[in-house]
């Protein structure tokens, strides 16, 4: 994987396992212990900003670490990125539920299956694009397996490892700012839906 390629350029194969551990543990901790307080204190929209901002910082530090071959800095960036996963991913994952609620509010029809299908499609599409992007960038930079890599290939790997995620996260923040307005209407929507349910009883 990309972490492995960076790690092998910095030290050895053992560092790959270390980095994976430093990524996994903070990610779990971020989801379990930081997501809830972040949602409660900031709300869904601002929690996304907090998580995305933390991940941008983490990826930027990892990018600088990869360029300077600084292992402690690489670990710090990995930990920051992992801890930021919870505040970012949890509110994003409830967007489908918000869409279902808002759809019911507008149409008086609750179509949960469509929301699930859209999320599933988006996940598969993003996975495919991510895999394709790795192949495209490695191909364009002249990557050759099991051989010493050129400076262009190394720069391409660092770009995928750090700077491309930063760009995508900035786009997420921009898109979320202009598209997601549900937070302003959520209380009204939920109150109306509850009112309709009570009227049926």
Q: Which residues make up each language-model segment?
A:
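Membrane-embedded alpha-helical bundles of multi-pass transporters/translocases
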Residues: 1-201
């Amino acid at each position: 994987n990309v972490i492995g390629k960076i790690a092998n350029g910095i030290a050895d194969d053992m560092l790959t396992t270390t980095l994976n551990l430093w990524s996994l543990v903070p990610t779990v901790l971020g989801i379990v212990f930081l997501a809830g307080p972040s949602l409660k204190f900031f709300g869904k929209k601002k929690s996304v900003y907090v998580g995305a901002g933390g991940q941008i910082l983490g990826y930027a530090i990892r990018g600088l670490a990869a360029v300077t071959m600084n292992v402690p800095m690489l670990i710090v960036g990995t930990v920051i990125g992992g801890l930021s996963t919870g505040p970012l991913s949890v509110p994003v994952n409830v967007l489908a539920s918000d869409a279902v609620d808002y759809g019911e509010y507008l149409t008086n029809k609750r179509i949960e299956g469509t929301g699930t299908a859209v999320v599933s499609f988006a996940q598969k599409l993003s996975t495919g694009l991510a895999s394709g992007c790795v192949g495209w960038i490695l191909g364009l930079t002249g990557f050759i397996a099991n051989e010493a890599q050129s400076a262009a290939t190394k720069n391409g790997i660092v770009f995928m490892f750090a700077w491309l995620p930063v760009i995508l996260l900035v786009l997420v923040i921009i898109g979320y700012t202009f598209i997601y307005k549900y937070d302003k209407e959520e209380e009204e929507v939920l109150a109306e839906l509850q009112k309709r349910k009570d009227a049926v009883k």
